[in-house]
């Protein structure tokens, strides 16, 4: 078995375990969004979001698709010449957390803890050179794997080191965040930081982390 086949087999095991997980009482009727639709396990850059959206990934089974957050994410990726085929996308919570009203809500600390082993194993399998967190929840979730003292407010769009990897915390691409916390022009600048981090990583490696187009 080749190294790539071994990675794929390990990922398949994690996908199967996540699909059967019922640790969170409030999400027992939800299904984990984790499959080949998340991206290639050979990807060298991983984006981590908060959780699948009710109108987006919970319905489409593909991270950041089917809703406005997904459209924004695709636009921001394209602005630095990245495509989904080049990256792996997952989230801090693999199932969609919903309020009693049926709307999206933030995953609880317990729910994030329950999902942290899936996130840890996914990171280990994919083994990305660069991790990009989308929003404060994703950044906080990394603490459950390897401690850090970063906050999104202080660390946004600043290249960091975490668990032996390059980490770039940026804001979530949701319409709410774009309207109130990080406008489109600012987010576009944040993605340029991601692009620079990729180029810098490429300079330090014989084999490029990822090819991007200016």
Predicted regions: what they are:
Residues 173, 207-214:
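Extended, histidine- and acidic-residue-enriched regions that form the cofactor-binding/catalytic faces
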């Amino acid at each position: 078995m080749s190294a790539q086949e071994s990675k794929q087999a390990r990922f398949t095991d994690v996908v199967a375990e996540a699909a059967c997980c019922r640790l969170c009482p409030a999400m027992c009727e939800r299904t984990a969004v984790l499959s080949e639709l998340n991206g290639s396990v050979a990807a060298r850059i991983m984006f981590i979001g908060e959780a699948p959206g009710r109108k987006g990934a919970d319905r489409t089974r593909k991270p950041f698709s089917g809703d406005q957050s997904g459209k924004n994410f695709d636009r921001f990726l394209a602005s630095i010449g990245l495509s989904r085929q080049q990256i792996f996308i997952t989230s801090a919570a693999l199932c969609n957390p919903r309020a009693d009203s049926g709307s999206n809500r933030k995953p609880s600390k317990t729910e994030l803890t329950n999902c942290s082993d899936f996130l840890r194993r996914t990171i280990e399998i994919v083994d990305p050179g660069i991790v990009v967190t989308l929003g404060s929840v994703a950044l906080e979730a990394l603490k459950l794997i390897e401690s850090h003292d970063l906050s999104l407010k202080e660390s946004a769009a600043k290249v960091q080191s975490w668990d032996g990897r390059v980490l770039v915390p940026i804001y979530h691409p949701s319409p709410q965040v774009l309207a109130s916390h990080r406008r489109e022009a600012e987010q576009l600048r944040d993605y340029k930081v991601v692009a620079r981090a990729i180029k810098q990583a490429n300079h330090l490696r014989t084999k490029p982390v990822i090819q991007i187009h200016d």
